[in-house]
Amino acid sequence: MNKTELINAVAETSGLSKKDATKAVDAVFDSITEALRKGDKVQLIGFGNFEVRERAARKGRNPQTGEEMEIPASKVPAFKPGKALKDAVK
């Protein structure tokens, strides 16, 4: 399912117009993104948790030259599914 299909599903199940469903979906994504940018954790009970995880610096290789290089530490978004979502998928 892509974003357009998600918007269509939200519009159909909620009775919203596609324009309003688009605004709602975008607002949810923007809210989650902003919370993660601030370093907050987003907990949606039953669905799952969005959080920012730290990746440690590590050694890697340039695939073109084979030269060893240092990959700097970074932050990455992560999602951990909740119990209800896990059970629904089984």
UniProtKB/Swiss-Prot annotation:
Keywords: DNA condensation, DNA-binding, Phosphoprotein. The keyword Disulfide bond does not apply. GO terms for biological process: chromosome condensation. InterPro entries: Hist_DNA-bd, Histone-like_DNA-bd_CS, IHF-like_DNA-bd_dom_sf. GO terms for molecular function: DNA binding; structural constituent of chromatin. It comes from the Bacteria. Histone-like DNA-binding protein which is capable of wrapping DNA to stabilize it, and thus to prevent its denaturation under extreme environmental conditions. Homodimer. This is DNA-binding protein HU. It comes from Geobacillus stearothermophilus (Bacillus stearothermophilus).
